[in-house]
Design a protein with these regions (language model features):
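Phosphate-coordination/substrate-recognition cap region in phosphate-metabolizing enzymes
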Residues: 8, 45-119, 180
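Active-site metal-coordination segments of metallo-dependent hydrolases
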Residues: 30-39, 128-135, 183
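Short beta-strand scaffold positions
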Residues: 61-62, 139, 161-162
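Generic beta-sheet signal
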Residues: 13, 156-164
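Short glycine/proline- and acidic residue-enriched helix-loop micro-motifs
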Residues: 111-136
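Domain-level recognition of soluble alpha/beta enzyme cores
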Residues: 178-203
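An N-terminal RHG(E/S)-centered segment typical of histidine phosphatases
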Residues: 1-57, 72-76, 154, 196-211
Length: 211
């Protein structure tokens, strides 16, 4: 990631897949909400070291534990212990309908400086969105990317920790694609960066980076 990270006036969106998960003991979480396994924890520690010196303006995570702990691994390496904003809207595709992930209080057990994102992107009082169909997944990831583009500006960098399938939708949304016939093979804790430029175009700067 350091090799391709340059101050070129773009808005940088870095999408990171979570570390290796374990679904054998989800405790009081839904069966779709796995934790990191021992390998995943070590992968995330290495991820934190990779991002230790990369300047980031904001951190987002889905409300699924494996993604949040991945984001936390980066933030724990930062001197200022930055906040992680939790967005249920970027949960994994196919997550059990009606389950919107872990609460803010629950996730603070793993990293204290956590808070729910300051807006519900569907404008409803309660979370109410689907993760099942292609159209549902396109809609919620597009809303999230538009939210980032409205909130942040050129020259800033945002990290988003999420899951395999959601990451593919997010990358496509950041690139401005409405339809696509390709699929990415995201490695655990890999980083994929899309740059958005003032001139109105987007660039896939790196894919599946592990360094």
């Amino acid at each position: 990631m350091k090799r391709v990270f340059e101050d070129n006036g773009s808005l940088k969106l870095i999408f990171i897949r979570h570390g290796k998960p374990d679904y054998n003991d989800c405790g009081d979480r839904d069966v779709s909400d796995g934790d990191l396994d021992a390998t995943g924890i070590e992968q995330c520690k290495a991820l934190g070291q990779r991002f230790k010196d990369i300047p980031v303006d904001a951190y987002f995570s889905s409300s699924l534990l494996r993604a949040f702990r991945t984001a936390a691994a980066i933030c724990k390496e930062k001197p200022d212990q930055p906040a992680i904003e939790i967005c249920p809207e970027i949960m994994e595709c196919g997550t059990t309908r009606g389950y919107y992930g872990c609460s803010e209080e629950y996730l603070r057990r793993y990293y204290p400086n956590a808070k729910l994102c300051d807006t519900k992107m569907f404008g409803t009082e309660e979370y109410d969105f689907g993760c099942d169909t292609d159209e549902e997944n396109k809609l919620r990831t597009r809303k999230f990317v538009e939210y980032l583009k409205d909130r942040f500006t050129y020259g800033q960098c945002v990290v988003v920790a999420c899951q395999y399938a959601t990451c593919e939708y997010l990358v496509a949304a950041a690139l401005g694609l409405k339809e696509w016939d390709f699929h990415f093979a995201f490695t655990y804790t890999s980083a994929t960066m899309v740059e958005i430029f003032p001139e109105g175009y987007s660039l896939l700067r790196c894919l599946n980076a592990m360094d």
